[in-house]
A protein has these predicted regions:
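Conserved Walker A/P-loop ATP-binding site and its immediately adjacent core
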Residues: 151-169
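Terminal substrate-recognition subdomain of acyl/acetyltransferases
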Residues: 9, 14-77, 175-198, 203-206, ...
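Walker A/P-loop NTP-binding motif
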Residues: 129-145
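N-terminal pre-P-loop "Q-motif" helix
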Residues: 88-116, 612
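Conserved beta-hairpin
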Residues: 127, 364-383, 389-391
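Conserved acetyl-CoA-binding loop-helix of GNAT-fold acetyltransferases
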Residues: 130-134, 433, 441-457
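Pre-Walker A (Motif I) flank of P-loop NTPase domains
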Residues: 111-120, 149-150, 366
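Walker A/P-loop nucleotide-binding motif
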Residues: 117-130
Length: 679
């Protein structure tokens, strides 16, 4: 590469740096730490040669040492290979040959109730995706001969992640003399078809949970897929290939390596074949450029090693809240930086080089950490300053639909709730990423970190703190709600990768400035959700809905609301609840009104249903799920659910309509039922 001298380079904005500018900061505020790190790492690399191209002056001589020419190993194809020799001849390394051999096991369908999984792991540049593509071609060829029609599926974060895999599927099929038809999504191949006999399709991760009839499934970069989706795929398919990168931004996060892989190994009904590809395709093992790349971009960053002494410090709450000097932290404190970023690499976050660049260079981004008293970082947090927007920009958002770059919470609050004053507040902090050391989960460290951040925010006069826009699940949502963060926005569509809805939360720090606004936004959010549960959120998990509908400190949506029921509706409700001749289907209108009353007045009344009772009325009444589906989601028998719902409705009738015993008109109904039964 030919960069300008560092003294000039740090005065220029790259395209990436231009893309991270926000209204509150101009070009002069952009930091250039990533360039400086890149330059310093290059100058400190033994085998790097640097020349001033203007003067032909050698700026840095390489230290070559005893350099041996690299010769790729000779490839030996197994004599008794079951895949076609034409496939094996496309392999570039012996490692790839052995990986192909490992995947031959997938040719046989496992016995009923059993599963066969192949797990391939590798660093970047080992040809992992390529060899899986060739294996799929070979498997499709063999299975077609056995069963005539083959349906294989490939899933990953997005179609671009499987472009190499699909490229080698095509190469493999052509080597086996097939003519292929391709379908594209943009420039990416998403489907490979051979006549009416072979179908190999890209399918989004969450959609795999409703797929049927796939002979073999490939999960590429499995560490980037949420664990619930991985468990769902495992439960649904008997032959699966999981591929994951060891180091790198797609890195095998601990969720995959410690939890999911452990689960596979311990499952008695699953045979697991593991293989690690170590041999690079284009260069020698231990190549210095690869080492430099990993080091510079923190691809191999790992969190601190945790010892028994560290657990003692945690038990004694021996913590330090770290407010680093960003220049010193990013450019001179290598050990702390690697610990900090290593937590992200090993956590559930999906990292790209741009994430490191944003953290280092974006003028509105900053970091905080929680360390033990011995200096080991145990919680990493990246934050962004938001708010303080001028009237002109706010007007463009309101009138012209302008999207405020780098100001997610103000943008959504203006667009969805019309609260323009919120964007003018002196400022807020949005937590972009918060992650706890993977070995120290569920020890209260995340909550401790939030408390420290909130203390600092109060001292600095910050108006609010926003929670990240994350894929909502019950455990994560409970963490934020337990710490006082209120939902203020939710996406109307599930994330195609995780299958989760993205939620934004906020917590007022300065009650006078942000408190009323955030409480109002939360009430509007709850009202929107309550009235959308038969629409875009009809399949949201009931426990998640229940938490999102939480009333905040006695902040009911409509405390004076009374159920709008006619006398006839009341009679049907009572007949249904007390076991009279009335079904749920004949009483849905009245039951729905009663349940809506509960949530509109929630926080103002003394009635508080048990949590599971709330999930019952959410799932069956507000989301209007069929009996069979509702029973499955709630983990009940259909008959049990039907009886339980009657009891819940009876409780609501007793509170809101003041029926405390069987009504007079029901007595005659009950008597007539008994007479009919006696006949």
């Amino acid at each position: 590469m030919i960069p300008p001298p560092l003294s000039e380079w740090v005065k220029q904005l790259t395209k990436f740096q231009q893309s991270i500018l926000v209204p509150q900061y101009g070009p002069d505020h952009v930091r250039h730490f990533l360039k400086v790190r890149f330059w310093n790492k290059l100058m400190n690399m033994n085998k790097a040669l640097a020349i001033n191209v203007d003067s032909d002056e050698v700026v840095k001589e390489p230290v070559l040492g005893n350099v041996q020419p690299w010769k790729p190993k000779e490839i030996v194809i197994p004599e008794k290979a079951r895949f076609s020799r034409a496939i094996y001849e496309l392999a570039k390394t012996q490692d790839q040959v052995e990986a192909l051999r490992a995947m031959e096991v997938l040719m046989e369908r496992p016995p009923r109730g059993k599963k066969v999984n192949v797990v391939l792991i590798a660093d970047r540049g080992r040809g992992k995706s390529a060899i899986i593509g060739l294996a799929l071609a070979a498997l499709a060829h063999r299975l077609r001969k056995v069963k005539g029609r083959v349906r294989l599926a490939v899933t990953a974060m997005n179609p671009s992640n499987v472009s190499t895999l699909m490229e080698f599927v095509v190469k493999g099929l052509k080597a086996l003399n097939y003519d292929v038809d391709l379908s594209y999504w943009g420039s990416d191949v998403v489907s490979v078809k051979v006549g009416v006999s072979i179908f190999i399709d890209y399918i989004r991760p969450y959609d795999m949970l409703s797929e049927e009839g796939r002979d073999i499934v490939v999960v590429d970069e499995a560490a980037m897929i949420p664990l619930p989706v991985l468990y769902g795929i495992h439960g649904r398919f008997s032959r699966v290939i999981y591929a994951s990168t060891i180091h790198g931004y797609e890195g095998a996060g601990r969720g995959f390596s410690l939890r999911f892989l452990k689960f596979l190994r311990e499952d008695r009904d699953t045979r697991v074949i593991e293989y690690e590809l170590k041999e690079p395709i284009r260069y020698a093992l231990g190549d210095p450029v690869e080492h430099w790349l990993f080091d510079t971009l923190l691809l191999d960053a790992e969190p601190a090693k945790i010892t028994n002494e560290d657990y003692d410090l945690i038990n004694k709450r021996g913590f330090n809240y770290v407010i680093p000097d960003l220049k010193e932290f990013f450019l001179t404190n290598e050990d702390q930086l690697r610990q900090f970023f290593g937590i992200y690499v090993q956590a559930h976050y999906r990292n790209e080089p741009d994430d490191l660049g944003m953290m280092m260079d974006a003028p509105h981004h900053f970091i905080r950490a929680l360390s033990l008293n011995n200096g080991k970082i145990v919680v990493s947090v990246e934050l962004a300053e938001e708010g303080g927007i001028n009237d002109e920009l706010i007007d463009l958002v309101v009138r012209g639909g302008l999207k405020l770059p780098g100001n997610i919470l103000p943008d959504r609050i203006i667009k969805y709730w019309g609260l323009t004053e919120f964007a003018k507040l002196r400022g807020g902090w949005r937590i972009i990423r918060i992650a706890t050391h993977p070995e120290l989960q569920d020890k209260g460290l995340g909550t401790e970190m939030l408390r420290k951040i909130e203390e600092e925010a109060r001292e600095r006069g910050i108006d609010w703190i926003g929670g990240v826009g994350f894929g909502v699940n019950a455990k994560l949502l409970n963490f934020w709600i337990r710490n006082g963060y209120m939902p203020v926005h939710i996406s109307p569509e599930r994330n195609p990768i995780s299958g989760e809805y993205s939620v934004l939360l906020a917590k007022p720090i300065n009650e006078a400035a942000g408190g009323d606004t955030i409480i109002y936004a939360n009430k509007e959010f709850r009202l929107r959700l309550l009235n959308s549960l038969q629409g875009p959120f009809h399949d949201m998990e009931p426990d998640v809905v229940r938490m999102l509908l939480t009333d905040w400190g006695g902040q009911p949506l409509d405390p004076s609301y009374s159920p709008r029921l006619t006398d006839a509706q009341v009679r049907r409700l009572v007949a249904y609840s007390w076991g009279g001749p009335m079904t749920y289907e004949n009483t849905t209108d009245a039951i729905t009104e009663l349940v809506r009353t509960y949530y509109l007045r929630k926080g103002a009344d003394s009635i508080e249903l048990p949590l599971f009772y709330e999930e019952v009325i959410i799932c069956k009444v507000l989301q209007a799920r069929p009996w069979k589906e509702a029973a499955r989601v709630l983990g009940l028998r259909k008959s049990t659910l039907m009886l339980l719902l009657r009891e819940v409705v009876k409780l609501l009738i007793q509170y809101y309509i003041k029926y405390t015993e069987i009504p007079e008109f029901m007595i005659s109904v009950t008597k007539s039922q008994r007479k009919g039964q006696s006949r």
